[in-house]
């Protein structure tokens, strides 16, 4: 491909046009190579530009002239290299010149344009500066222009990429208003209309002529006489980028949205762009930049989609889950958005599908719901959804009819069954009265005594037994309504009798069946126990009372024939009707089951399509919609995923079959980007621990990578038992080994999922616990003598016998002290961990407590210091150098002068002070009783208390408080200096940053005032401020980064408006750090406390449960019985020991150590550098939507299993 390395400037007024004409080379030999290097910008921009960066300008861009006129021609002497010449008909445009009073201000004026190009850099040895044809009067202009242009275009050049492979790209960019969040109404349809018209005008060869017509009032840009030479290889697919154009005039006068892109395509053939290949080529290099130590770089993009292709493009993006869309309609109601009708249709389809799904789950025999296939996330077409909607509507109506018919049939069946039971019981009641004459004779033969007995029994107000109550007074009545029969629930039998008896004032008699029968509820199919009742009464008033009581108890009354013959006929008819109803119900259920069985395989597919449709339309409701149907939205995309997103948009564009390709342009914004950390199944649990405290701010140091090591280690320090750690490790390995089986079962138990989700952190906690258990030489409260103890018994047999005899005589135990000079061999020091001799020593707690306490202090101070050093990474990243000077350095010095000094004392005491009398640091050390007390010494250090030097006085006698004196030379002077330095660091931390901010702010204001005065003096006139808002062209400038992101990182809001806020914040931060160093150091002593508690509980479990349980049979005198019981007792004791160890030592103690380790990381460690006030990156991912839908299905299935046999009816 030919290149252009020479530049021809159209001169301004007062310049010599002949000089410009002479710039054109006369032959191809005069052309330099295609590469050229430019300097690092003007002095005013050198802070923004790295001199080592190189840029290739193809074709050369002329930003210092009001009108750029370029002609593609062939060089003389047969050279094929094209070059630029001056267009002879040049008319300068006064409006563009008036836009800026001075050309040096063009690149700084918010109303101006910048000419950008994103090609590869020229090489240094072919610089255009070495061209012999360039005269010295033009050369400074070229250099000045290049410096100014490159300095302003630095960040933009990094983000622009060639739109089509192997083709040149000319970019014209305007600044975006970063402070104005208003989104103006745009007519996106005219963008594409303008592009088509320009595309047609670029199809012919000739002159490429750009005419800029710019005024402050109109702010218009026009393209005139656009022609491309057909012989030029650069005449294809040139791309022009425009940003923050409020009004742009082209042939069709389109109104452009910020960051819109218009493609001008000529008729000459060109290689097609393949976004998929580009994504594969660039994604690997971009992904290497991502790291877990900081959040992924995020970019805000504007996405413009034609309405016909919007669904396919958004659905294709949802397959990857790497885009977070911004809701541009947050102030609008959900019911007033564009695609609310589509959302309602999806919700209605989902409702119908859930209804059908419940029919499948609750049918008999049961059908297991199928799972959704997450491998294929392809979106359904609109035709498929219309067909699905019709099918669901048809199935819903069909099943509603089936349910209603089934309800009616079952209700009739229950009624027939109840009626049959009533007639049977009534027939049994009246079996002894088959003939009417027999009944009359029975009434007349009743004696007076019987009647008196009957009346007396009711005269006392008692309630006789219903089944023993005589019926004689009512049987001879001529009234037809003398009894009522029916059924009622069995559990209401006794209360029904009592209420009816009292309501009728003891004048009605109730008989109920002793045996009950079962009917199924027609709605829920639950079995119901019912019984038959008969109420005997006389009179219309009693009949009304009986009916009201029956209604109150939900009792059903049935008309029963008086004669036995009629009753038997009715029973025969009822039995036949019941058989017919049973056949119809069985046939209906068979048909119903067949439909549901076939439908159970289709429901997951339907549910997936509905959820995809619903999720996509929910995202599309976040877009703003033009009146002509174009959608514009904003989204956050990880920088490493940009190519994948563009490829997804390209695939969606192809699937839609439209002609307008989607637009994806980067935007500048002051809004804080979301935080996105890439994790896998191993690191996810550690990132979740950090995010539970607070999501890190954008690009803030992420504590999760360090937590992977420090969290299990601190846990193991408190849980230091090798045996318990091994059990924990085996449990974690079981979960890891059976991951696929456990996930396939889809267990929804919350407690189980908590342990399963933390399987990898359990594995690390188990490994570190085994390590610390070996350090402590502790396993089930027992030590292992692997390498041989360095201690030995220095007592002979005679001395031991004497001590034993004395212990026997005194009836007490004596402890023998092993003298180190005689009993310890320094050459046989235990190589790893604690010597096993301490496990049987009486003073083991004194030794281990001192060791663990000091080790906890060292570990805590080390982690806090590490956290302070991590804070400097944030300061460097955000270029907050004032924080390094006023916060980081004083904090490190403060920690070093007090707490690191304490750690050094601990280590020195361990190394140099022993039980032997020797000379230590120039002082005669008498022995272990004079070992320096570090805690009291630290207190005396702050109190500046006068102490003795050394351990012996002038007479060689040991001081009474020798452990409180100075134990190394010049200790008082050293400690005084350390205290003074640490106290001097406090005002630096308190006032350093606020005073610096005040100084820089006042200096900046003065510089701005001086610059404004100079500009007014140079122009000689007073220039009124433009009506349009002044914006910065490009990304935010960070000359004074310590006043921008650094403060935002510390406070989380803009603090420049009030200096008092800075003082208050810095005071809080300083007090928190100074007091926190003391309290946090004491907080790390929990490492020692929990380790001690765990060791003591282990010892209690071993000796008091296992050992003592095994020896309980030792007191049995019969050896045979003792030998038989000992294995049983040992098994029982071991079972109790194992149960208590698992429940208390591993579960409870493990949970306690976990929570304490969590607190040490959240408060003591992360408070030194971590704010955690960001917001997470929530990407639009179709798989997550489908998983939520699957959870609803599984929950429905679980509830159906709980209430097995229920039948849904709507």
UniProtKB/Swiss-Prot annotation:
Residue stretches spanning the membrane: 716-736, 761-781, 856-876, 893-913, 977-997, 1128-1148
Glycosylated residue positions: 1010, 1019, 1118
GO cellular component term, pick one: plasma membrane
Expressing tissues: Expressed in uterus.
Cytoplasmic compartment residues: 1-715, 782-855, 914-976, 1149-1210
Coiled-coil ranges (or none): 339-405
Compositionally biased intervals (Low complexity): 259-271
Self-association and partners: V-ATPase is a heteromultimeric enzyme made up of two complexes: the ATP-hydrolytic V1 complex and the proton translocation V0 complex. The V1 complex consists of three catalytic AB heterodimers that form a heterohexamer, three peripheral stalks each consisting of EG heterodimers, one central rotor including subunits D and F, and the regulatory subunits C and H. The proton translocation complex V0 consists of the proton transport subunit a, a ring of proteolipid subunits c9c'', rotary subunit d, subunits e and f, and the accessory subunits vah-19/Ac45 and vah-20/PRR.
Function: Subunit of the V0 complex of vacuolar(H+)-ATPase (V-ATPase), a multisubunit enzyme composed of a peripheral complex (V1) that hydrolyzes ATP and a membrane integral complex (V0) that translocates protons. V-ATPase is responsible for acidifying and maintaining the pH of intracellular compartments and in some cell types, is targeted to the plasma membrane, where it is responsible for acidifying the extracellular environment.
Protein name: V-type proton ATPase 116 kDa subunit a 4
Gene: vha-7
